[in-house]
Amino acid sequence: MKHLHRFFSSDASGGIILIIAAVLAMLMANSGFTSGWYHAFLETPVQLRVGALEINKNMLLWINDALMAVFFLLIGLEVKRELMQGSLASLRQAAFPVIAAIGGMIVPALLYLAFNYSDPITREGWAIPAATDIAFALGVLALLGSRVPLALKIFLMALAIIDDLGAIVIIALFYTSDLSMVSLGVAAFAIVLLAVLNLCDVRRTGVYILVGVVLWTAVLKSGVHATLAGVIVGFFIPLKEKHGRSPAKRLEHVLHPWVAYLILPLFAFANAGVSLQGVTLDGLTSILPLGIIAGLLIGKPLGISLFCWLALRLKLAKLPEGTRFQQIMAVGILCGIGFTMSIFIASLAFGSVDPALINWAKLGILIGSLLSAVIGYSWLRTRLSPVV
């Protein structure tokens, strides 16, 4: 029990469980004994009906649309806390990770387009390498233990949070179609109600969650991706402490283990099961997986390092205290771990086009993320001071 408690107390535990879930999915999807069970689980129909309202989806879509909304709720809470009280609370504090995140989204997307611009179908996946998996990246960093400067951890967390926020904006602007104005009207009313609750300083989290469920349903029916509802709810839950209690911080504390140890591993298990049947060298070196691998492995660190270097040269920002530029470059490599967020965007980009494209995209994401994790860990390990 002591070893189990120590494992779950470690910052690396969430990343390790994610890896186990992804490997298990790959094994089950490629085993003659378990592939049928694996796909049957994902295709299991789940229906929810309240009066005339009906939501009928398979298990995979419930995981991607409903459970991931809880993950985005946690992201919303984290972003709000960092903006109001944390590492993004002042312009000077926020400048360096914001500039790094912008470079880390623009350059990978451009590199992907350099490979895929000639194909109008695969071109739609330009945002896939722009994402960072915050749980995986922090998990790999945590494997280095106390050798990692606190400022470097905060920089990676702030960068990844801004990156996630950028991914949310990209999803809202570029991966949304067939809008229902009635449902959008209901969603707008729910958002106004959340704002009123916040202005009236209503501190019961359950009320916000109840309105959030209405918002999620309306957004789902509107054609906008339903996970965005989670972020919106997170922004409106009160952060300010009263009588020593903060509803936002308390909910963040409650949600964190559920997201780290259940929701993200379940998402990884449901989405990382890529069949290797029919995979050839020609396929792996085709423009789609190559563009993703190049975007994650080369574009991410190049964009982050280049934009950070320019920010320092132009005196727009300064290095986090106690860090060196080579360590920032190593963190840039770790940010190439796209995994869950990249897979999520790939499912939006190609979900209604061709399942084979999603398969090739996932392979590119898995290879690019794995290489980024190994190289980033190795490079950073050689550039950190040993523990005395």
Curated annotation (Swiss-Prot):
Membrane topology: Multi-pass membrane protein
Record-linked Pfam families: Na_H_antiport_1
A GO molecular function held by the record: sodium:proton antiporter activity
InterPro entries: Na/H_antiporter_dom_sf (IPR023171), NhaA (IPR004670)
Major localization listed first in the record, in broad terms: membrane
Top-level lineage group: Bacteria
Transmembrane segments: 14-34, 59-79, 95-115, 125-145, 154-174, 179-199, 219-239, 254-274, 287-307, 328-348, 356-376
Record key words, sorted: Antiport, Cell inner membrane, Cell membrane, Ion transport, Membrane, Sodium, Sodium transport, Transmembrane, Transmembrane helix, Transport
Reported function: Na(+)/H(+) antiporter that extrudes sodium in exchange for external protons.
UniProt similarity note: Belongs to the NhaA Na(+)/H(+) (TC 2.A.33) antiporter family.
Name recorded for this polypeptide: Na(+)/H(+) antiporter NhaA
Organism whose genome encodes this protein: Citrobacter koseri (strain ATCC BAA-895 / CDC 4225-83 / SGSC4696)
